[in-house]
Amino acid sequence: MADEGRHKDFWSEAFAIQGSVTPLVFPRVLTFGVIAALIWIANELTHELDFHLAVAPYEVAGAVLGLLLVLRTNSGYDRWWEARKLWGGIVNQSRNLAISGLTYGPTDPEWRSNFVRWIATFPHVARCSLRNTRELPEVTKLLGEEEATRIAAAGHMPSYVAMRLSQTLQQAVASGKMDTLAFLQVDKERASLIDHIGGCERIAKTPLPRVYAIKIRRFIFLFLVTLPFALLNKVGWVTPFVTMFVAYPTLALDQMGIELQSPFSQRKLGHLPLDEITQTIEKNVLDLLRVDESLEQK
């Protein structure tokens, strides 16, 4: 509901700087404005040369360019939304794994606490793995510094945590405190976590083909550099401002597509709120543990 309210104020959204691509594209917009100004000055100083072009081709080219930019933005959004769905799966599977472990696992309080804490560790480790960092303060709080150091030293941290979860379940089966059918059900939930992080890694390590960006940006450059020649006879000295007016949405849409392509990078404006998501998972599974402990005491 808080996010819903945040998008209701038209004026605050229209003039927002934080979270906007405007600071990123404004230098480029200004550059095209300067180029247009130089073209207008050259036209004014050199009257014997005809620098003018017809407007009609730019109307067609503008429509084509707009379509390409929308497709580019949609491609970026599809990647962003797929990443969000995968993290939604991690949220749900973490809850399911905690519920299944507490329901079918041993009644030993130490085992249950250890198992749930390893579950709470997984999303933090997955987030850090996707962001290429091995600083694990949340894991230190959950499992202690020694375990956090072991996880940080692992080649693939999410797989290490998933392995420890599987070992914890296997120990319960070996001790006769968990039957095989229950183990298979709970381990199925655990395996799903690896499937989801694998999907996230596929997105993170497979950028859109660079040739796609090169062609679109080359088209943008040619369109905006030559646009002033079509405007000179129409708007005169206002040509630089009209060029900038056209350049802003064009370059902004291009940048939006770039920002949405990397949903896990904190350097991108459109990155997923993984800190909040992982904290939510930790809180949810630890709450389940507390509820279970209170029920055991009754």
Sequence positions of predicted segments:
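Long amphipathic all-alpha helical oligomerization modules
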Residues: 212, 227-231, 238, 257, ...
